[in-house]
């Protein structure tokens, strides 16, 4: 049954595509870094996409994220995530549901399935800065390389976002913090942050500087549970 979790979300996507007066958004990021110290070389590349279809107050978004990190040609991270998120958006609130499928070799997880619901509000909006707060609840199931490890259940998922832009300087910025403690077991949690600054070169291309962190308190022996990335690259955006 697990493989059918995303089917209702894809059906909703097709419904939206069949309506009139729809708009599209397409966003691609290609960022990376290279380091060399005492002949020890580390390469890190992240490729992510976001596509959305909007009709009236309905939006269906699909995002992907792939990261490959190597040290002296040895693979440390080789992770991929696919997320589908339909939502209803108004000026000061949103209601959403989502399904997410991941393969996380860095964490020795063959497959992670997540599905949940939630809502968010806009707490303030100024010329240069906006803040949104959201809360969701999700069910997750991890399938580890080691089949003796079992970790599934329900997590809280509060999130805070700050973002804005300075149009005169062609500058956009974004900060996000996500905390996901397991229900009934707060020692098992996930903490992620993301912050970036983008300078638009033209209507389609921009230069992006990004810093992300991802920490998981529950992890398999030998897994990479604390990941930090500082990345520089290009952004392509079509609205």
Regions found by a protein language model. Give the residues of each.
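Outer-membrane beta-barrel "beta-signal"
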Residues: 226-239
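Residue-level signature of outer-membrane beta-barrel architecture
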Residues: 51-53, 86-88, 101, 121-123, ...
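Repeated loop/turn-to-beta-strand initiation elements of outer-membrane beta-barrel proteins
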Residues: 55-62, 92-96, 127-131, 165-173, ...
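Short glycine/proline- and aromatic-enriched beta-strand/turn motifs that initiate or cap beta-hairpins
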Residues: 19-61
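Transmembrane beta-barrel strands of outer-membrane/channel proteins
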Residues: 28-34, 62-66, 84, 97-101, ...
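Membrane-embedded beta-strands of outer-membrane beta-barrel proteins
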Residues: 47-49, 82-84, 117, 158-160, ...
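Detector for outer-membrane/organellar transmembrane beta-barrel domains
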Residues: 130-181
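Solvent-exposed loop/turn segments connecting transmembrane beta-strands
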Residues: 35-44, 70-77, 103-111, 145-147, ...
């Amino acid at each position: 049954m697990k493989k059918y979790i995303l089917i209702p979300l894809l059906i909703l996507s097709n419904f939206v595509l069949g309506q009139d007066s729809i708009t599209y958004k397409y966003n691609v990021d290609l960022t990376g870094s290279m380091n060399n110290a005492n002949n020890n070389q580390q390469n890190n590349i992240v490729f992510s996409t976001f596509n959305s279809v909007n009709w009236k107050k309905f939006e269906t978004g699909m995002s992907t994220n792939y990261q490959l990190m190597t040290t002296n040609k040895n693979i440390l991270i080789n992770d991929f995530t696919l997320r589908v998120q339909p939502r209803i958006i108004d000026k000061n609130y949103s209601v959403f549901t989502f399904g997410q499928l991941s393969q996380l070799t860095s964490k020795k997880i063959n497959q992670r399935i997540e599905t949940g619901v939630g809502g968010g509000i806009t707490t303030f909006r100024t010329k240069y800065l906006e803040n949104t707060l959201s809360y969701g609840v999700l069910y997750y199931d991890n399938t580890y390389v080691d089949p003796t490890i079992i970790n599934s259940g329900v997590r809280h998922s509060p999130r805070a976002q700050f973002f804005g832009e300075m149009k005169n300087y062609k500058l956009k910025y974004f900060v996000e913090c996500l905390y996901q403690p397991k229900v009934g077991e707060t020692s098992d949690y996930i903490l992620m942050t993301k912050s970036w600054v983008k300078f638009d070169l033209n209507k389609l291309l921009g230069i992006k500087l990004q810093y992300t962190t991802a920490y998981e308190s529950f992890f398999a022996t030998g897994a990479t549970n604390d990941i930090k990335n500082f990345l520089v690259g290009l952004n392509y955006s079509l609205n």
